[in-house]
Swiss-Prot record:
The keyword Transmembrane applies. It comes from Homo sapiens (Human). It is a multi-pass membrane protein. The lineage of its organism: Eukaryota, Metazoa, Chordata, Craniata, Vertebrata. Keywords: Chromosomal rearrangement, Membrane, Signal, Transmembrane, Transmembrane helix. Residues 1-21 form the signal peptide. This is LHFPL tetraspan subfamily member 6 protein. It is linked to A chromosomal aberration involving LHFP is associated with a subclass of benign mesenchymal tumors known as lipomas. Translocation t(12;13)(q13-q15;q12) with HMGA2 is shown in lipomas. It is found in: Membrane.
Length: 200
């Protein structure tokens, strides 16, 4: 099967897919922030949450429903910062995934990725990583929302975790973006074969 990638390009394609998958999984999982409420573990993502309080009419008290799900609407996300984070991080993950899938197709299709296309793809990866990094930087601005303060204690605020801790999905998302920005962008410059020019 013909490939439009150099040996470095094949490594770039595989690493691009790994970085994109890592960032996308981290983005989708609701484990960016860990805490507890009413004695039950609670976790948050940018647009999803695990365990939430509901009022039990029969017992006339608040109880925790231990299941994960996304917020009922985009406006239901606890803070404007998290809504922006969701859009920015989602867009960045989409760009990384687009480049990764194109790079993997370049392993099987000849003349798909030239040196110029590889460099443009690297630039798109850098932009995607930058967007995800911006989303990760925005996320702590939402820690002063009422939902987070109920879970992390009323000492929590912007960039102050209170009783909570950062979860593995936050690190996973950031690590995928960092690797895409630093490694994949550099490898992309050497990924495409030099185009052959045929005289017609």
């Amino acid at each position: 099967m013909a490939s439009s990638l150099t040996c470095t390009g094949v490594i770039w394609a595989l690493l691009s897919f790994l970085c994109a998958a890592t960032s996308c999984v981290g983005f989708f999982m609701p484990y960016w922030l860990w805490g507890s409420q009413l004695g039950k573990p609670v976790s948050f993502g940018t647009f999803r949450r695990c365990s939430y309080p509901v009022h039990d009419e029969s017992r006339q008290m608040m109880v925790m429903v231990e299941e994960c799900g996304r917020y009922a609407s985009f406006q239901g996300i606890p803070s404007a910062e998290w809504r922006i984070c969701t859009i920015v991080t989602g867009l960045g993950c989409g760009l990384l995934l687009l480049v990764a899938l194109t790079a993997l197709m370049g392993c099987c299709v000849s003349d798909l990725i030239s040196r110029t296309v590889g460099r443009v793809a690297g630039g798109i990866q850098f932009l995607g990583g930058l967007l995800i990094g911006a989303g990760c930087a925005l996320y702590p601005l939402g820690w002063d929302s009422e939902e987070v303060r109920q879970t992390c204690g009323y000492t929590s605020g912007q960039f102050d975790l209170g009783k909570c801790e950062i979860g593995w999905a936050y690190y996973c998302t950031g690590a995928g973006a960092t690797a895409a920005m630093l490694l994949c962008t550099w490898l992309a410059c050497f990924s495409g074969k030099k185009q052959k020019h045929y005289p017609y």
